[in-house]
Design a protein with these regions (language model features):
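Glycine-rich FAD pyrophosphate-binding loop
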Residues: 2-24
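C-terminal catalytic lobe of FAD-dependent flavoproteins
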Residues: 271-352
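Mid-domain catalytic core of redox enzymes
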Residues: 218-258
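Helix-loop-beta segment of a Rossmann-like dinucleotide-binding subdomain
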Residues: 64-77, 100-153, 245-249, 304-311
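Flavin-binding catalytic cores
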Residues: 95-98, 201, 205, 222-223, ...
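Helical element adjacent to the flavin cofactor pocket in flavoenzyme catalytic cores
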Residues: 124, 128-186, 194
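Central helical "cap/lid" subdomain
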Residues: 18, 177-225
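Dinucleotide-binding Rossmann-like beta1-alpha1 core, especially the glycine-rich loop
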Residues: 27-115, 266-271
Length: 352
């Protein structure tokens, strides 16, 4: 928005927990996103198509290396049952792509091993799905670069501000944080797990829930695994990240031995040589999920000029959020098929 000449203040609260923007896996992903919502499939595809230019521009502006790689991504299967389930999933996703641009295929174990010549696959590996549109990025560098670009172009960053109250009167919003007051004619709520509470203050119902994911990180080693997966990826520095756990419920970001053990065991079943690496770090972070795990984009009917945005795919969709959503908010240019992302889909009576 600052690139379009808007005067923007970013209010960020105090949060000592590891949030999704800092604790994520860094995937720029298509193949597993959008089941049951064709518009979301196309949204993710368009976002990945915009990512190379988005990354290049951000690196040139800020000097941060995002380490963005669009190598394609894998989902590796263990056993025939997982393999068949994946076949069914990919077929359903392919049929859901209205444009026919969803590019994902199943590959055999032999083909998979030929793609990974420097590391041996486990005996139970039965094949994988491969999506040429997938890739990965260093998430902390992305966050730093976006914050840097925002401030370089005139944006004002106000950290350690917890919004306590939002009022709307005479086409103007007043935001109170306890230490400061802010006024604006347009308000964008992108508050992660606080979105539900904040959106209610301006007449919007946006349900979000936390889901904990835990991650293990190994020591650095030579690059041998060139394709990211949702469970295993090798970072630019050579360390491996292992993850993909899902625990719904509370706001606890602690790790648990049982879950970390399960993550490690599955990773070793896929890549047995990982057992030779030392584990050096682990963490838990909270995903921000709507009931169907799809995005919500909404303008308030009660308080025009207030918008709510929430998505589990913040990294994957960063390229499209910084372009098309800006046009929606500043220029009222509503993207085609945007009603699919309205939260009325969670209310059966309203959706009919």
């Amino acid at each position: 928005m600052v690139k379009k000449g808007a005067k923007v203040i970013l209010i960020d609260r105090v949060d000592n927990r590891l949030t999704a923007s800092r604790g994520n896996f860094g995937l720029v992903w298509v193949q597993g996103k959008g089941k049951g919502m064709p518009r979301y499939v196309e949204w993710c595809i368009e976002a990945t198509e915009r990512w190379p230019e988005f990354a290049e521009n951000l690196e040139n502006e800020t000097g941060f290396n995002l380490n963005y790689e669009k190598t394609g991504g894998l989902e590796i299967c263990l056993g025939e049952e997982e393999h068949q389930e994946r076949i069914n999933f990919i077929e359903e996703m392919s049929q859901a792509s209205n444009s026919g641009r969803y590019d994902c295929e199943m590959i055999s174990k032999k083909k998979l091993q030929s793609m990974l010549p420097k590391i041996k696959l486990g005996k139970e590996v039965s094949g994988a799905s491969f999506c040429s549109q997938d890739g990965c990025v260093t998430p902390l560098n992305l966050l730093k670069a976006m914050n840097s670009s925002f401030q370089q172009k005139g944006g004002t960053y106000r950290p350690e501000q917890t919004v306590q109250k939002i009022e709307f009167s005479s086409n103007e919003f007043k935001i109170e944080t306890g230490t400061h007051n802010f006024k604006t004619e347009k308000l964008v709520i992108a508050g992660g797990l606080m979105t539900t509470k904040l959106a209610k203050m301006v007449g919007m119902e946006v349900p979000v829930i936390p889901e904990r994911g835990q991650i293990l990180v190994t020591e650095r080693t030579s690059r041998v695994f060139n394709y990211p997966t949702a469970e295993i990826r090798q970072n630019y520095d050579g360390s491996f990240m292992l993850g993909s756990s899902h625990e719904a419920g509370d706001y606890d970001t602690d790790t648990s031995y049982e879950v970390l053990q399960k993550i490690a065991k599955r990773a070793i079943r896929i890549l047995p040589n990982l057992k030779n690496l030392q584990l050096i770090r682990s963490w838990g972070a909270l995903r921000v999920l709507t009931p169907d795990q799809k995005p919500v984009y909404l303008e308030s009917d009660q308080c025009p000029g207030a918008y709510a945005i929430t998505s589990h795919s913040g990294v994957s969709l960063a390229s499209i959020h910084s372009s098309i959503l800006v046009e929606w908010i500043l220029e009222e240019r509503i993207p085609p098929g945007f009603t699919a992302f309205h939260p009325k889909r969670f209310n059966v009576q309203e959706a009919i």
